[in-house]
């Protein structure tokens, strides 16, 4: 008796008897564990000898782009009928990488991650790959089997890659290379796809920023989707601090409004009794000597200033605790 296999691997993808959607899901599941372990290894490498190297964070991002993304998205230009579960799993993996790089908690506003690192979402990466692949198939000669299938899907609007790419072309308002005779080289097509999808992604991020009070009132609203210069120009530890400053995640009391320890005192600064917001730290009179000779508009000076401020605060808090313990004894 011949037993039927529920799934098998072909050219790196899992083919499942449940259909295209299930095949994509099983393919992602098959690669997820390896990608997850690789991300942890990348984190260990950059936290070891690149922690004090300028551009260390950018190096970690480059490794992710050159190693993890190609492996997890191999053949993704042919993944059709993907469901939201598969897309969300890929987004979670990318967000895990970004959080690992920036050493931030899971509570970080996720739109800020892509905005600062200048990366597309995993779904948008796949969309770009599909749009590039459909150009390639369209350009093949009539004798190619792939072109024959392409023509069948195009002429009869059959479910498949052509139908999905029609929707993507409409979504991103791209030239209709499927149904119209558009004179455009492969390089021109890739450039316009990359530019248009990037602009569309930036607009979506701005809409998501509105859902976070920390982001809609911060500098990220104006800077758009791009790799920020400080990620290349600062040491890894400094770049991580700068990310927290820009996303209002520094441990100022007003950044932790729900903490009962600070709410009971109306989030006042222990040094000047003003509301201890992150912007207040920039002009707090108690820390004025630390600002002498520094330009708080300069990324490096700003990071050094914040580091010294919170070092002093941590020391003062320890002394306060020790004093209370000595008094009670």
Positions of PLM-derived features:
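Acidic catalytic cores of enzymes that act on phosphate-bearing nucleotides/polynucleotides
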Residues: 86-89, 93-246
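Family-specific functional microsites
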Residues: 45, 49, 207-329
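Beta-sheet entry/capping signal
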Residues: 7-8, 281
């Amino acid at each position: 008796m011949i037993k039927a296999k529920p799934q098998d691997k072909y050219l790196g993808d899992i083919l499942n008897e449940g259909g295209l959607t299930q095949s994509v899901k099983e393919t992602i599941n098959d690669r997820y564990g390896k990608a997850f372990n690789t991300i942890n290894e990348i984190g260990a490498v950059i936290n070891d000898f690149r922690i004090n190297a300028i551009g260390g964070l950018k190096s970690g991002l480059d490794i992710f782009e050159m190693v993890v993304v190609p492996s997890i998205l191999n053949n993704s230009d042919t993944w059709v009928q993907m469901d939201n579960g598969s897309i969300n799993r890929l987004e979670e993996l990318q967000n895990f990488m970004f959080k690992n790089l920036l050493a931030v908690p899971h509570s970080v506003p996720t739109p800020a991650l892509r905005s600062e690192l200048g990366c597309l979402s995993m779904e948008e990466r796949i969309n770009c790959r599909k749009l590039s692949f459909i150009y390639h198939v369209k350009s093949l000669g009539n004798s190619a089997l792939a072109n024959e299938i392409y023509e069948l899907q195009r002429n009869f609007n059959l479910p498949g890659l052509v139908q999905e790419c029609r929707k993507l072309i409409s979504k991103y308002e791209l030239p209709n290379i499927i149904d119209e005779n558009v004179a455009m080289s492969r390089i021109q097509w890739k450039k316009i796809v990359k530019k248009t999808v990037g602009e569309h992604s930036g607009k979506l991020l701005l809409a998501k920023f509105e859902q976070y009070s920390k982001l809609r009132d911060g500098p990220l609203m104006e800077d758009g989707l791009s790799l920020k210069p400080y990620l290349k120009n600062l040491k890894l530890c400094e770049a991580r601090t700068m990310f927290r400053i820009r996303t209002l995640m520094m441990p100022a009391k007003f950044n932790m409004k729900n903490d009962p320890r600070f709410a009971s005192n109306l989030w006042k600064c222990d040094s000047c009794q003003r509301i201890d917001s992150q912007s207040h730290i920039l002009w707090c009179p108690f820390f004025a000597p630390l600002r002498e000779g520094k330009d708080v508009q300069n990324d490096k000076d700003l990071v050094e200033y914040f580091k010294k401020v919170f070092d002093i605060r941590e020391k003062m808090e320890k002394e306060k605790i020790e004093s209370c313990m000595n008094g009670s004894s």
